[in-house]
Amino acid sequence: MSSKQPSLSYKDAGVDIDAGEALVERIKGVAKRTARPEVMGGLGGFGALCEIPAGYKQPVLVSGTDGVGTKLRLALNLNKHDSIGQDLVAMCVNDLVVCGAEPLFFLDYYATGKLNVDVAATVVTGIGAGCELAGCSLVGGETAEMPGMYEGEDYDLAGFCVGVVEKAEIIDGSRVQAGDALIALPSSGPHSNGYSLIRKIIEVSGADIAQVQLDGKPLADLLMAPTRIYVKPLLQLIKQTGAVKAMAHITGGGLLDNIPRVLPDNAQAVIDVASWNRPAVFDWLQEQGNVDETEMHRVLNCGVGMVICVAQSDAEKALEVLRAAGEQPWQIGRIETCGADAERVVLNNLKNH
């Protein structure tokens, strides 16, 4: 080795191993708080081990992965990192529960140009809080410090979740039929979808979202409100009634694109848009961006985070169980029969908005 050339280290290349190890130490307690009895061992192994919970006759594993889209850009711009982890968990676990699955464990991937231990620990603490709300274990993850791939301390997130459902109790929409009722659960705001449009509206309007107030709250807080996690109330509904025929997590694509994913070929969802008061944040976005009404429902959830299909005769019981679980449900529409070329989702009373 030439004595004239300085000795290079990984740190010189932009990767701080000590920072990575410091992060792991800080988040071990977060993972421990989420632990389920089926999880074997703590953080730090090469792989995470988890038993199938007792009591299942024919357990089927259900998996999902997701991110939080460009809501992350807004979080970075606002330097607000405490709830984006809950968004990440919600996007994954809500997709599992619509199959009837109980989430078991969750892993995250955090990639950054330069690791800021405080920011990363804040994000992972939010992931842990989301896992607690969903009843699943945070069993591991990957923190990748990749200089030259991301600008400064910018970071990207992905989440991965595995759940379990009894084979005979999988909810797949196959029993949906004309006359069934559709029940909605409210969202907390835009959740984690439509943020490229939202950011464009903010840019075009020139609004200072920290200063704009809607219903007495800063617009920035309304836009960063964490995605709701519906797992526990929905699992209670399934267990107590056995009445759930289908569920749709209202994400990117809104009501128009997500409900058809769980409908049989001849079924059409007829939605009464006048059945709920759209939160003010959506009205502000529509007004500032001059967004077409149908486009609003195709991009944003417009105040609806989850739609549940039950027989009309089970609707009142379902509403009762959901209210007892702390939800504020309402009947948003019904199922009708339709032809092959018909619209799969019909939005009535659009003019009322």
UniProtKB/Swiss-Prot annotation:
Which pathway, per its entry? Answer: Purine metabolism; IMP biosynthesis via de novo pathway; 5-amino-1-(5-phospho-D-ribosyl)imidazole from N(2)-formyl-N(1)-(5-phospho-D-ribosyl)glycinamide: step 2/2
One GO BP:
adenine biosynthetic process
Assigned keywords, A-Z: ATP-binding, Cytoplasm, Ligase, Nucleotide-binding, Purine biosynthesis
Asked if the record carries the keyword Cytoplasm, the reply is yes
Similarity annotation: Belongs to the AIR synthase family.
Quote the catalytic activity from the record.
2-formamido-N(1)-(5-O-phospho-beta-D-ribosyl)acetamidine + ATP = 5-amino-1-(5-phospho-beta-D-ribosyl)imidazole + ADP + phosphate + H(+)
Can the keyword Lipid metabolism be found in this entry's annotation?
no
Name under which the protein is recorded? Phosphoribosylformylglycinamidine cyclo-ligase
GO MF entry, a single one: ATP binding
Localization, per the record, is: Cytoplasm
Instruction: State its Enzyme Commission number(s).
Output: 6.3.3.1
Q: Which organism is it from?
A: Pseudomonas aeruginosa (strain ATCC 15692 / DSM 22644 / CIP 104116 / JCM 14847 / LMG 12228 / 1C / PRS 101 / PAO1)
Task: Give me the Gene Ontology terms describing cellular component.
Answer: cytosol
